[in-house]
């Protein structure tokens, strides 16, 4: 099979064989230069045309002439036509120097061919399309001769007036495009005269000429065909003529000769209007010939459209043409417009016509292969509007057969329908089990299957999604999320899991992100795809940046799935120990602000206080926060039972960072709002400027985050349980455990310690929770004003406290002057347990005592430094004997210089 030639004007085997045909006919049959007229040379012309056709068939350039042509061979056929034109005897012949150097090698290879023979070959040997292109794009001095010759030869080529109409239409289309492609006012006048002559000669536009057709039915058919062709030419010519670029084939035909024409005019519309008026005059005369009987006869006639009968098609074409004419002030005044109005009023749009069809008729029409692209699209739109089609195998098969015509709109229609199915099924419970309950089983199997629509998903929606561009894919995924479709339908391919794992294993942050493959994975299982992506985000800062870059490119879709990432990471021990886990999960908490948009100020990223790519309101922000805090609570619950201290520590650090981050967010937001208020003063009516209103909205939402967080009961209760589980005694003390306890207590004290100011209901809820805890002491302190009455109470609390709690207790003991007694009791308890953990606990508590003692000594000015030192030494003397020297060193290092004590002199005095 011959493919499209990049250089159609190169010498080739086809030209060599064609050259032989013409030379043989010139020498053996009849000399071509003696063929002056068509008449009398019919047999010779037919013979040459047959030989050329056979040659084109031999090269597979045409198949079953003249019905089908190999589209890949069009450039070769263009070259063949130019080859014939260059060797045609024209009315005046340019000398060789006037031919373009690009085609000089093809000249004089054949005996001079009569011009009418070239036209005959073009018409009879499937070169009509290249001929039309040549007439529209070729040099005007040359093409005008072909218009004249075509006018003379048309009735000879085919004496049937109806069958000549398509050939006439081709010439008229070419003339209209020639005016635009090469606008030469002087030559245009000659061309317009030729067109007027051609129409007058070949169109039967009067009653007398029409009656030359022998039968009334033939006359009615002729009028329909003539109107059809004329209206099509006018629509082709007048529909945005200046916006259409020159065709690619223009270069092939325009390079035949050097440019010897006058300069082009910049505005072809005057001549184009003149051209249209010539055709409209003819159309007006034809309208006058249409009787009621003829109009009704058209109703029974088939048209070239599978959708319309002849009458309906003409009415529709007339309505389209009238709209185009009325958009032009001059053409809209043509008398034919009034004649066209009644036809236009009876026109049915494509949408109206397909809506009238029964389902079976619509499917036959779509599958007939006879519909135009415009008709197919209208039919498919109507099919998609009939929701019953989505569950019908034949309808789905028809949709699948026309995937190339389907767009994002059709995917959205399917998803909207599936969303309605899911919504209806969520309401109806089957044997007491709802769809929601069924789908909560397996994280990996995000969706369930609905067999009624399995083929719709596999044969239509999935391949349709694959052919969409990236932006459309994102919009389709977002609509599916909004409609909650994945709750009822399975979109996964059998090999989805393997491809997803391979995708992330091969992902390289230094290379271009394969967004199309990623979106396909999201189509199949968006939740798990985003979760797997987040697993990379906790491993390295570059993967984290990549994650958020992709999330910000499809923010509304990502917003539906980022909470699931937090749900997964915060209960995964391995992921929580990754190097970037803390920072990445903190970003997950603020994902609504990140997705809406960030900006850089003073080299720092700041949260935008305006509607960005993913605006949010109070409901969206609270929902995202609640989901994240739920995940934190689940993480605490999971890791506290096996006392997984590293995982607990990260979650507790995360809660601390959240608290600090919210404070920073509020501070920066307030500063930005103040700047905006200065930049945008109030309006005349006293209202805030629109930008300030939006900024106040987001500032209020951000400022509400701490309050909402501190009212999240699930997290409150699990923080309380975590603190209770982390409480230690002398037998279980370890530094890492106390570090975690410190974080948990910090979070509690940061916002929840002032429970005396809470409402009765909240206090009672916490009291009920306290009653279920093992260590109630500190909670009673938080809930009641005075619960510490004796040293035993202090000692009990000290041996389960965090660093800050111990510090606070020691301050109270120093104030009551009971510190020495409590430290003595503590020392006795440590000696009694006599374990490494007990001695470590004493060291820990003594360090906190020193911190409290420093504050006490600083503010108590009534006692001398020596007295403070002596008191401290009395406490040191209470330390267990085995670690007393170590405790002494800690005390001396902290206070000897401060109190002016010479340790060496003191030790010498003791000796």
UniProtKB/Swiss-Prot annotation:
Domain of life: Eukaryota
GO cellular component: SMN complex
Effect of loss of the gene: RNAi-mediated knockdown targeting all 3 Gem4 paralogs (Glos/Gem4a, Gem4b and Gem4c) is larval lethal.
Function field: Component of the survival motor neuron (SMN) complex that catalyzes the assembly of small nuclear ribonucleoproteins (snRNPs), the building blocks of the spliceosome, and thereby plays an important role in the splicing of cellular pre-mRNAs. One of 3 almost identical paralogs (Glos/Gem4a, Gem4b and Gem4c), resulting from a genomic triplication, that have some redundant function. Required for neuromuscular function and organismal viability.
Quaternary structure, from the entry: Component of the core survival motor neuron (SMN) complex composed of Smn, Gem2, Gem3, rig/Gem5 and one of 3 almost identical Gem4 paralogs encoded by Glos/Gem4a, Gem4b or Gem4c.
Listed name of the protein: Gem-associated protein 4c
Source species of the chain: Drosophila melanogaster
Lineage, top ranks: Eukaryota, Metazoa, Ecdysozoa, Arthropoda, Hexapoda
Gene this chain is encoded by: Gem4c
């Amino acid at each position: 099979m011959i493919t499209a030639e990049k250089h159609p004007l190169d010498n080739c085997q086809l030209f060599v064989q064609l050259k032989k045909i013409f030379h043989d006919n010139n020498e053996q049959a009849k000399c071509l230069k003696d063929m002056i007229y068509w008449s009398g040379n019919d047999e010779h012309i037919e013979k040459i045309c047959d030989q050329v056709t056979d040659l084109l068939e031999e090269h597979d350039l045409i198949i079953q002439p003249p019905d089908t042509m190999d589209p890949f061979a069009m450039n070769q056929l263009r070259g063949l036509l130019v080859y014939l034109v260059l060797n045609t005897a024209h009315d005046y012949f340019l000398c060789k120097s006037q031919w373009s150097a690009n085609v000089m090698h093809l000249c004089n290879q054949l005996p001079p061919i009569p011009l009418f023979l070239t036209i005959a070959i073009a018409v009879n040997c499937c070169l009509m399309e290249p001929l039309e292109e040549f007439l529209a794009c070729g040099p005007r001095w040359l093409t005008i001769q072909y218009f004249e010759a075509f006018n003379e030869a048309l009735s000879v080529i085919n004496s049937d007036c109806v069958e000549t109409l398509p050939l006439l239409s081709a010439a008229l289309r070419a003339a209209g495009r020639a005016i635009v492609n090469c606008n030469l006012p002087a030559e245009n006048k000659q061309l317009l005269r030729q067109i007027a002559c051609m129409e007058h000669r070949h169109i039967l536009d009067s009653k007398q000429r029409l009656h030359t057709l022998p039968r009334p039915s033939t006359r009615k058919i002729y009028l329909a065909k003539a109107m059809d062709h004329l209206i099509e030419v006018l629509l082709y010519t007048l529909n945005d003529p200046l916006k259409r670029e020159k065709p690619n084939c223009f270069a092939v035909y325009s390079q035949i000769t050097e440019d010897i024409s006058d300069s082009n005019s910049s505005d072809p519309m005057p001549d184009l209007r003149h051209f249209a008026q010539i055709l409209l005059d003819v159309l007006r005369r034809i309208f006058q010939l249409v009787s009621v009987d003829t109009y009704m006869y058209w109703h029974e006639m088939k048209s070239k459209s599978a959708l319309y009968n002849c009458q309906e098609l003409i009415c529709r074409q007339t309505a389209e043409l009238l709209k185009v004419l009325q958009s032009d002030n001059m053409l809209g005044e043509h008398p034919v417009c009034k004649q066209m109005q009644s036809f236009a009023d009876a026109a049915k749009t494509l949408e109206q016509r397909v809506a009238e069809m029964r389902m079976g008729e619509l499917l036959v029409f779509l599958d007939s292969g006879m519909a135009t692209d415009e008709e197919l699209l209208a039919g498919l739109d109507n099919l998609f509007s009939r929701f019953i089609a989505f569950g019908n195998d034949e309808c789905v098969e028809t949709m699948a057969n026309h995937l190339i015509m389907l767009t994002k709109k059709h995917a959205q229609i399917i998803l909207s329908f599936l969303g309605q199915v899911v919504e209806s099924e969520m309401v109806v419970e089957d044997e007491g089990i709802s769809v929601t309950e069924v789908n909560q089983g397996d994280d990996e199997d995000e969706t369930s299957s609905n067999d009624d629509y399995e083929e719709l998903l596999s044969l239509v929606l999935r391949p349709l999604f694959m052919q969409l561009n990236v932006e459309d894919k994102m919009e389709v995924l977002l609509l599916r999320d909004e409609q909650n479709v994945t709750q009822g339908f399975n979109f996964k391919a059998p090999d989805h899991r393997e491809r997803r794992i391979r995708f992330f294993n091969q992902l390289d942050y230094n290379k271009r992100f394969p967004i199309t493959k990623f979106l396909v994975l999201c189509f199949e299982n968006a939740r798990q795809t985003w979760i797997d992506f987040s697993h990379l985000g906790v491993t390295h800062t570059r993967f984290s940046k990549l994650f958020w870059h992709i999330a910000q490119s499809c923010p509304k879709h990502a917003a539906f799935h980022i909470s699931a990432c937090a749900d997964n990471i915060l209960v995964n021990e391995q992921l929580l120990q990754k190097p970037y886990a803390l920072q990445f999960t903190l970003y997950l908490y603020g994902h609504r602000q990140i997705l809406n948009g960030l900006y850089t100020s003073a080299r720092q990223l700041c949260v935008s206080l305006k509607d960005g790519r993913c605006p949010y309101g109070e409901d969206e922000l609270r929902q995202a926060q609640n989901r994240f805090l739920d995940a934190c609570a689940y993480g605490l619950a999971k890791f506290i039972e096996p006392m997984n201290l590293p995982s607990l520590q990260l979650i507790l650090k995360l809660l601390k960072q959240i608290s600090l981050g919210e404070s920073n967010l509020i501070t920066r937001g307030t500063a930005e709002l103040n700047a905006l208020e200065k930049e945008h003063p109030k309006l005349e009516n006293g209202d805030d400027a629109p930008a300030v209103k939006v900024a106040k909205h987001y500032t209020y939402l951000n400022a509400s985050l701490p309050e909402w967080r501190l009212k999240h009961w699930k997290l409150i209760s699990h923080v309380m349980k975590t603190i209770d589980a982390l409480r230690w005694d002398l037998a279980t003390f370890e530094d890492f455990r106390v570090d975690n306890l410190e974080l948990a207590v910090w979070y509690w004290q940061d916002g929840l310690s002032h429970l005396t100011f809470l409402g009765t209901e909240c206090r009672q809820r916490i009291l009920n929770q306290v009653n279920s805890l093992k260590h109630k002491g500190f909670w009673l302190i938080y809930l009641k004003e005075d619960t510490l009455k004796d040293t035993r109470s202090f000692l009990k609390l000290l041996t389960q406290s965090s660093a800050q709690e111990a510090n606070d207790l020691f301050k109270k003991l120093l104030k009551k002057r009971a510190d020495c007694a409590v430290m003595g009791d503590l020392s006795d308890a440590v000696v009694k347990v006599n374990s490494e953990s007990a001695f470590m606990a004493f060291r820990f508590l003594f360090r906190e005592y020193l911190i409290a003692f420093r504050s006490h000594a600083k503010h108590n000015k009534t006692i001398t430094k020596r007295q403070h030192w002596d008191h401290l030494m009395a406490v040191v003397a209470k330390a267990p004997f085995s670690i007393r020297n170590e405790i002494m060193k800690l005390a001396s290092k902290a206070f000897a210089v401060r109190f002016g004590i010479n340790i060496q002199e003191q030790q010498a005095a003791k000796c």
